[in-house]
Regions:
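Intracellular juxtamembrane helix-capping segments at the cytosolic ends
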Residues: 206-217
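Helix-loop boundary and gating motifs at the non-cytosolic
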Residues: 2-52
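MFS 12-TM fold signature
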Residues: 84-90
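Residue-level signal for conserved functional micro-sites within the alpha-helical transmembrane segments
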Residues: 22, 55, 59, 204
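Cytoplasmic membrane-interface "Motif A"-like loop-to-helix N-cap segments
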Residues: 68-83
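Conserved small/polar residues in nucleotide/adenosyl-binding loops
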Residues: 218-224
């Protein structure tokens, strides 16, 4: 057997695009959902699992559709091009929605800003919150306002700069609670974000199945 180098490079590039997309998706979307919209880890996980649920139906569907497609551009190319373009445009659109949500959090979003920390404390002082490990706490019972405002995201420990556990365990959940309050007051931004996210997932399904379908059949050719 002789390797079809051109076909192998094209198929490898398709896999590279898919892997790059999912790396960006898996590293970015959960942070937006929890930090900007204030969603819990549980609900963020549900949304992040949608791609696997949709893949069960979408990948076989678009694979079968591309198998039956006939056109001047071939069976796979239109799906690959259209799916990639739509996914790229929708990812850019998601960044604009993210920026719109950030404007709702402008008074509490700054890191290590005393004014932002004061706003967070005033809004969440009496609320019952959860640390990342799931422990409940009431902010006003843990810190006075002055103590809370002095918390910084990083501290010096044994000559090294490390993440402050008080910031991770108490400031971050309090800020996320403020983000959820803002989302509850203006849910349209979250709804629009989820709709765009679904479009991204569907467009990637349009691209993924046709892109990898040829790999089993055409990356090797018999010598003549």
């Amino acid at each position: 057997m002789k390797l079809n180098y051109k076909r192998t490079i094209f198929v490898g590039f398709a896999f590279f695009l898919i892997c790059s997309f999912w790396q960006a998706y898996d590293n970015t979307i959960p942070l937006i959902l929890t930090n900007k919209f204030g969603m819990s880890q549980a609900w963020s996980g549900v949304i992040m699992a949608l791609d696997n649920v949709l893949a069960l139906f979408m990948l076989p569907l678009f694979g079968a559709i591309s198998d039956k497609h006939r056109g001047k551009r071939g069976r796979r190319t239109p799906f690959i091009v259209v799916g990639t373009l739509i996914a790229a445009v929708m990812l850019i659109a998601l960044s604009f929605v993210d920026s719109a949500q950030l404007r709702h959090l402008s008074d509490v979003s700054a890191i290590d800003d005393p004014a932002a920390l004061e706003q967070i404390y005033d809004r969440q002082a009496g609320e019952t919150l959860l640390t990342p490990s799931g422990d409940k706490f009431v902010l006003s019972q843990k810190f006075t306002q002055e103590e809370f405002i002095r918390i910084r995201s990083q501290v010096e420990q044994d000559g090294k700069t490390v993440t402050n556990p008080d910031y991770t365990n108490y400031v971050v959940p309090a800020r996320q609670a403020c983000a959820w309050d803002a989302t509850a007051k203006s849910p349209a931004t979250l709804v629009f974000f989820i709709v765009l996210l679904l479009i991204v997932l569907v467009s990637m399904a349009v691209f993924r199945s046709p892109a990898v379908a040829p790999v089993s059949y055409t990356h090797l050719t018999l010598p003549t």
